[in-house]
Amino acid sequence: MPVCEQVAFAGGNGKLAGRLFLPDSGSDATDPVAAVLVAGTWTSVKEQMADRYAEELARRGFAALSFDFTGYGESEGVPRDYESAALKIRDLRGAADFLGGHPAVAGTGLGVLGVCAGAMYASAFAAEDSRVRSLALVAPWLHDRRICDENYGGPEGVEAKKAAAAAARHQYEETGEVAYVPVVSGSDPDAAMPFDIDFYLNPGRGGIEQWPNRYAVMAWTEWLDFDAIALAPRLTAPTLLVHSEGAAIPDGARRFHAALAGASEFLWTEGGQFDFYDQPRQVAFAADATAEHFARTL
């Protein structure tokens, strides 16, 4: 059984709380193992899906770190529940610094696993940090402006969200008050995901008490302006994508894969987007594939 250590380390804007999952052999400092950072999807806390993948990788022989990004869950930082790609990339750098000094970790380079939107942050980090020797993206949400237009009501919808973000930013700077909308709600058209999604609303899945289901409106601009597809030509680390035609924006994954500069592999399977977060079949498929990828490339 994997060993789980509760850990804390410096992130981009305060102390971050994490869990380091180690295989039985990895708990022995004389037998270090390869390390993998796990980045969960947007707005998530570690207990929703990052812990699951970290534990599965530890079962397969890796030291795997999941953690709450700045302003989320048990980690420090304000504003709370504020989605910032730049800050999350800095947090990944801090997590890599922590793993690099841990006695259970072999100094053979770092693997990074990104789930859903975590794939964007993992890719951006890998593009700028030579410590990343291998990258795996599971059910990756990889967008650019074209994909945002297609998913957020066209150019007018995108600009409306950015205008709301600017107003919310002004309010925060003037008063310190953060304007929030639900992350998930089928009854609120302003929700970040205006649908009733079982994974996020079911307490037996991802609708857990550690996750407050709120999205800082001022985060929209950075989210919508992020171009994940443009990262692909900058990536030289071997990259694996695991996706499904029934999951989110497979066209983004295809375009990203086609633009990759380094060695790559694309595995297609079946399942909806949220199945990859907690359903045994999809998680096992993805965990097996990513473990095999990291074993070959780290």
Describe each PLM feature range:
Residues E56-E76:
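Conserved alpha/beta-hydrolase
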Residues G272-A284:
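Catalytic histidine-centered segment of alpha/beta-hydrolase-like enzymes
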Residues S123-P203:
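Alpha/beta-hydrolase-fold enzymes
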Residues W42-E55, F69:
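The serine-hydrolase catalytic nucleophile loop
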Residues M1-D31:
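N-terminal cap/lid segment of alpha/beta-hydrolase-fold proteins
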Residues A104-C116:
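Alpha/beta-hydrolase fold nucleophile elbow
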Residues Y82-P103:
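Alpha/beta-hydrolase active-site loop
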Residues L235, L241-H243:
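Short beta-strand/loop motif that positions the catalytic acidic residue
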